[in-house]
Regions:
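Gly/Ser/Thr-enriched, mixed-charge loops and adjacent short helices
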Residues: 2-12, 121-253
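Short beta-strand-to-turn element immediately C-terminal to the catalytic PLP-Schiff-base lysine
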Residues: 125-128, 269-273, 353-354
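N-terminal small/polar loop signature for handling phosphorylated ligands or for N-terminal nucleophile
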Residues: 44, 52-120, 211-271
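Buried hydrophobic positions in well-ordered alpha/beta secondary-structure cores of metabolic enzymes
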Residues: 20, 58, 96, 109, ...
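An N-terminal, well-structured beta->alpha segment
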Residues: 1-80, 106-107, 163-196
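Proline/glycine-rich low-complexity loops and linkers
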Residues: 88, 95, 143-176, 273-345, ...
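Phosphate-binding and adjacent anionic-ligand microenvironments
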Residues: 256-257, 297-463, 467-484
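Gly/Ser/Thr-rich active-site loops/lids in small-molecule metabolic enzymes
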Residues: 134, 222-224, 276-295, 362-370
Length: 484
């Protein structure tokens, strides 16, 4: 069996780290053996770097078999003589990152497929400081894991590892919650007496967000809070479609807002007081303006190339810079550190703020948004209306298209090698192939065409002054490449 495995994996590796870690279908690619191959490859890396004396934090989400995958990973690391801090309950990914940073660990792991469909699970790897592992780490890690056979994996009985002190449970949730409470104006939130509806989307944010908001004396109602490994039949990703139940609850209860997080709580979704879904782009703009205007912070902003250029307008108005990076939050956090940026984020719902962790955190972002509403004394809808009055409006559309591997190869060659692009019928300022293909038009509109790093999809984003103009750009791309 071992020789067959080695032959198979040499021809067709089953582990691939993309922009959001490694994700695969449970029992197809995401198996006990493959997970333990990643753990063994990580253990070998830790030992070769001479940091085996530092513990590794492992956490997990609410998905099917996530606790078991976490224990199986811990077994391998412990068998290699590495101490594992296993978080004692399903935990938000940002809490796992925070724990890696707080305990001074060299590495950490999260068993999660984030916002992917329920049939998936995955692994995210973190490095010192609680940062997403960069491609210089994940590529050698995946290559090493794919080269391993079953007999190359070291194992130890869990009872033996625990008795030897190699595996211990970690109860860091209270510390993480306290760190967020210490970073916001709890007194202002208490005085506002806000009614908030939470939607953890059957994920891991319930305990943290409930505790934070109830400590700040918010009136909190929660839906979709139990564990459901099928996520209620929905994609655990906040969007206008998946948050309709939350919107209904906000309107029915007369709440100030609804807050949702994705499956592992690193992404945020918000419903305003009118029941409208606030796009992550709008949340980023709101918080950047709030940090600059209300909190008196100074500094640039970082966004990925598929995120609104409204951030550029806010930055220019305050004499600041807006830096553009490829998709993948590790690029955002790296550029933030390089330029001492005060906020960074992406249109898919992830953001972080200077002084917190170097990764996206839906729990922290949601709490900061509550502070903003409390201190400004206005509804979210009114606050964003003020933004539009000041900076104008940009509309963004995102569409996804499936493909066969043959069709993907054709599109890669046509777009990225031959640079064969539609005419578009408007002035093109320049084209970038930094990550996929981005066309910048002279009127400040743009379009991005790129393959997802986490799902088998081709994504097309367009932003323009009006929805109709953005849709027109999308339609030209779809027609030219025959995507529909």
């Amino acid at each position: 069996m071992t020789e067959e495995l080695k032959t198979y994996t040499a021809q067709e590796p089953q582990i691939h780290f993309g922009t959001g870690g490694w994700r695969a279908i449970i029992s197809e690619g995401f198996t006990q053996l493959n997970v333990q191959r990643v753990a063994q490859a990580l253990a070998a890396r830790i030992i070769s770097q001479g940091v085996a004396d530092k513990p590794v934090v492992i956490g997990y989400d609410q998905r099917f078999l996530s606790p078991e995958f976490a224990w199986w990973s811990a077994q391998v690391l412990a068998a290699n003589g590495i101490h594992v801090h296993l978080i004692d309950r399903p935990a938000p990914t940002p809490m796992i990152m925070w724990t890696v940073k707080d305990l001074g660990c060299a590495y950490g792991m999260a068993i999660t497929a984030s916002h992917n469909p329920a049939i998936y699970n995955g692994i995210k790897v973190f490095t010192a400081g609680g940062r997403d592992a960069e491609v210089e780490i994940t590529t050698p890690l995946q290559d090493a894991a794919n080269a391993l056979g079953a007999d190359d994996i070291k194992l130890i009985e869990l009872s033996q590892a625990q008795a030897a002190g190699l595996i211990s449970t970690q109860t860091s949730m209270n510390w993480y919650i306290d760190s967020i409470l210490d970073s916001v104006d709890v007194k202002a939130i208490r005085h506002a007496h806000l009614k908030i509806v939470l939607d953890p989307m059957f994920g891991v944010s319930r305990t943290c967000l409930q505790t934070i908001l109830m400590t700040a004396r918010c009136d909190v109602e929660t839906i979709h809070e139990r564990r459901d490994t099928l996520f209620g039949g929905r994609l655990p990703s906040p969007s206008s479609k998946t948050l309709q139940a939350l919107a209904n609850e906000v309107l029915e209860r007369g709440a100030a807002m609804g807050i949702a997080t994705d499956g592992d709580a690193d992404r945020l979704g918000v419903i305003d007081n009118t029941g409208k879904f606030l796009h992550p782009n709008e949340i980023l703009v709101l918080l950047y303006e709030y940090l600059l205007e209300e909190k008196g912070w100074h500094g640039p902003v970082v966004r990925n190339l598929a995120t609104t250029h409204m951030l550029d307008r806010v930055a220019r108005a305050h004499g600041e810079q807006c830096y553009e990076v490829p998709v993948g939050f590790k690029w955002v956090s790296s550029k933030m550190a390089e330029h001492d940026a005060i906020i960074g984020g992406e249109s898919s719902g992830g953001l972080t703020v200077k002084g917190h962790i170097a990764g996206k955190d839906g729990v922290y972002a949601g709490t900061l948004l509550v502070e903003m509403v409390a201190k400004k004394g206005k509804h979210l809808s009114e606050i964003y209306a003020d933004i539009v009055a000041k900076y104008g409006q940009l509309e963004m559309i995102e569409t996804d298209y499936g493909f066969t591997m043959e069709r993907k190869a054709q599109l890669l060659e046509q777009i990225y090698e031959r640079h064969d692009l539609p005419e578009f019928g408007q002035v093109v300022d320049h084209v970038s192939y930094l990550d996929g293909c981005k066309v910048y038009f002279a009127d400040d509109s743009w379009v991005v065409i790129r393959f997802s790093g986490t799902e088998p999809l081709l994504r097309v984003f367009a932003e323009a002054a009006t929805y109709e103009q953005a849709q027109g750009i999308i339609d030209q791309v779809v027609a030219y490449y025959q995507l529909a």
